[in-house]
Amino acid sequence: MTGSNMSDALANAVCQRCQARFSPAERIVNSNGELYHEHCFVCAQCFRPFPEGLFYEFEGRKYCEHDFQMLFAPCCGSCGEFIIGRVIKAMNNNWHPGCFRCELCDVELADLGFVKNAGRHLCRPCHNREKAKGLGKYICQRCHLVIDEQPLMFRSDAYHPDHFNCTHCGKELTAEARELKGELYCLPCHDKMGVPICGACRRPIEGRVVNALGKQWHVEHFVCAKCEKPFLGHRHYEKKGLAYCETHYNQLFGDVCYNCSHVIEGDVVSALNKAWCVSCFSCSTCNSKLTLKNKFVEFDMKPVCKRCYEKFPLELKKRLKKLSELTSRKAQPKATDLNSA
């Protein structure tokens, strides 16, 4: 376009805002082909010039950044700031792409997608883990899905068995697969190797073996059924197919002393329908030691030596004697009257 044609075009042009013509020496603002007087190129809300020429356009009207945010920009559900540019709409809220993150692992979800879980937005792996936790199941560490059947445990992690093949024969593995020296084998191939299997963890035993309860065990896995501490070569006691350390075997199955309430180790004194340590069986009045050969009487469910008994008031001794006679009479079997029939 020649200079004369340009002048003619400007002479016929009008301001986009006020529709007035331009004077020949006037400065004109051109915004995407739209012409404005310099004083007309202002924010449609506050009527002020755009700071540094930056403006936002909405429905044919131009706004400064502040007014555009106040009028139209959504607030981020995470940081609370206005969102300019891409908006993520999810969970009945608006988000900056960088603010919309998994509530458990903090990974960005904008381009990954998310799953709603108990009012939370989670990435799919975290959702699967939470789902598995609620069902009491494992999550496969390869595909990150719930393992509905029995998992294959490999290097302390759970997997779907069909992700692996036997190192020896190449067959797809099942949950019965065995790990040996960092490799996985199907059960038949593993059994051919003659490696013992631990009765606790069901894994091969490559070092020292403990033979007990008709099974083989890793040393650290052969433990007391009560306290779960390894025996580590110490003596164990067996009961109904389980192994116990001496302390807990005595606590569970041994006699408890009526006096000290401890499990009785060694000889047991049985008297007054109770069990006593040899050292605890004594006169409850003078504390002199008693044996079953000594004469004693029962008073307040405890033994009293003959010497202390003789010091009791006469009335008390009569009552004790009568009580003893009644007790012995009840203990005797009743005679049958043959003439009563």
UniProtKB/Swiss-Prot annotation:
One of its GO terms (cellular component) is cell-cell junction. InterPro entries: LIMS1/2-like_LIM1, PINCH-1-4-like, PINCH-1/2-like, Znf_LIM. Its main location: nucleus. GO terms for molecular function: metal ion binding. Disulfide bonds: none annotated. It is found in: Nucleus; Cell junction, Focal adhesion; Cell membrane. The modification Phosphothreonine is found at T327. It is a peripheral membrane protein. GO terms for biological process: cell-cell adhesion; cell-cell junction organization; cholangiocyte proliferation; integrin-mediated signaling pathway; negative regulation of apoptotic process; negative regulation of cholangiocyte proliferation; negative regulation of hepatocyte proliferation; negative regulation of neural precursor cell proliferation. Keywords: Cell junction, Cell membrane, Disease variant, LIM domain, Limb-girdle muscular dystrophy, Membrane, Metal-binding, Nucleus, Phosphoprotein, Repeat, Zinc. SMART domains: LIM (SM00132). It comes from the Eukaryota. The keyword Repeat applies. The keyword Cell membrane applies. The modification Phosphoserine is found at S328. Residues 13-74, 76-133, 138-195, 196-255, 256-315 form the LIM zinc-binding domain. Interacts with TGFB1I1. Interacts with integrin-linked protein kinase 1 (ILK) via the first LIM domain, and in competition with LIMS1. Part of the heterotrimeric IPP complex composed of integrin-linked kinase (ILK), LIMS1 or LIMS2, and PARVA. Adapter protein in a cytoplasmic complex linking beta-integrins to the actin cytoskeleton, bridges the complex to cell surface receptor tyrosine kinases and growth factor receptors. Plays a role in modulating cell spreading and migration. It is linked to Muscular dystrophy, autosomal recessive, with cardiomyopathy and triangular tongue: An autosomal recessive muscular dystrophy characterized by childhood-onset of muscle weakness progressing to a severe quadriparesis. Additionally, patients have biventricular cardiac dysfunction due to dilated cardiomyopathy, and macroglossia with a small tip resulting in a triangular tongue. This is LIM and senescent cell antigen-like-containing domain protein 2. The gene is LIMS2.
